[in-house]
Amino acid sequence: MASILRRGDSYSVRFKYKDHAGRICEGWESFKTKKEAQDRKISVEKELLDGTFLIPDAMTVAEMLYKWIPIQSSKHKWAPKTYTHTVAMIQNLVVPYLGKKQIQKVQTYDLEQFYATLSRTPRGLYKQGVKQTLTDKQKRQFLTGASIREVHAMLKTAFSYAVEWGLLLKSPIPREAPKSTSEERAIWDEKTMLAALQTMTDPTLHLAVHLSMILSLRVGEILGLQPGDINFDAADGRGTITVGRSLQRTEKAALEKTDPNQIYHIFPDQREGSSSALVLKKPKTKKSSRTLYLTKPLKEELLAWLEKLRQDELAMDGR
């Protein structure tokens, strides 16, 4: 039960509750009038009885996010790059502005103001949580709407966990995400593609660009291809190539925090003391694993490339 005490010109409601560790604590809330105190006495007794009382907690936004990220990463089996990117968002786009604020004091209005601040924030203002000195040109290059929407999506998920953990009764995240204007990427037409290929003299670069143009492969997917991924006899001799892995450079710290089953191989360091590693990993999503058809010119170039590799291996063995 709660009680009301008069303290000078104000009235205090005193009550007992159990914190997250099960310890019995005493709560005090002050009001200017006796009527306000009486109303709060009734409401807090009801909350304590039906389990809707919000246990006071001084956890900050930064503390909550750094508690949430390893749980989210493990639960959804994040790739190292996803982990690194999310940590960077927290360090550089959230903590400098909201990090010290207690989550129980965050209001929807605070977040709307936060998004407005981000829209006026130059890209790269913070790196690893440290404020950078920018040039005049860099100061005019602001965060994109897509970046702010990404921050919104992350906070929406993180604050939903805070509700599940009993730190909040409801999430303060605004219902509508910040607006984002998408910019269409300029894509080469067929004539430009052919002209580019015809001017390339480096065979490695030529094959990589040819694969990218015809099959729409990402750089990491091209670098992750192996001879066994190619079936020249499939599709009635047309030939296919199967995408099933990707080569990527990632921070070693992220590798320690993410699912090891996402990684096929970690390559040895080329430089001693490097903070990152080159890894061969599973594709970004299940849909990223796919089988694609070859064109005749691409098939011929792949055959020639593999034959050259075979000849090079024979030459090395003969030494």
Positions of PLM-derived features:
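Short, surface-exposed polybasic/aromatic micro-patch for ligand or macromolecular engagement
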Residues: 2-58, 285
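Conserved tyrosine-mediated DNA breakage-rejoining catalytic core shared by Y-recombinases
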Residues: 7, 192, 225-307, 318
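Short regulatory "switch" loops immediately downstream of catalytic or recognition motifs
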Residues: 16-19, 113-136, 231-234, 244-257, ...
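Short, Lys/Arg-enriched alpha-helical recognition elements, typified by the DNA-recognition helix
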Residues: 57-163, 177
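Phosphate-coordinating loops and pocket residues in cytosolic domains that bind phosphorylated ligands
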Residues: 66, 105-108, 120, 169, ...
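Short, basic (Lys/Arg/His-rich) helix/loop patches that form interaction surfaces
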Residues: 123-127, 141, 198, 202-205, ...
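Basic, Lys/Arg- and aromatic-enriched nucleic-acid-binding interface segment
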Residues: 127-129, 133-145, 149-151, 164-227, ...
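Extended amphipathic secondary-structure runs
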Residues: 151-167, 184-187, 285-319
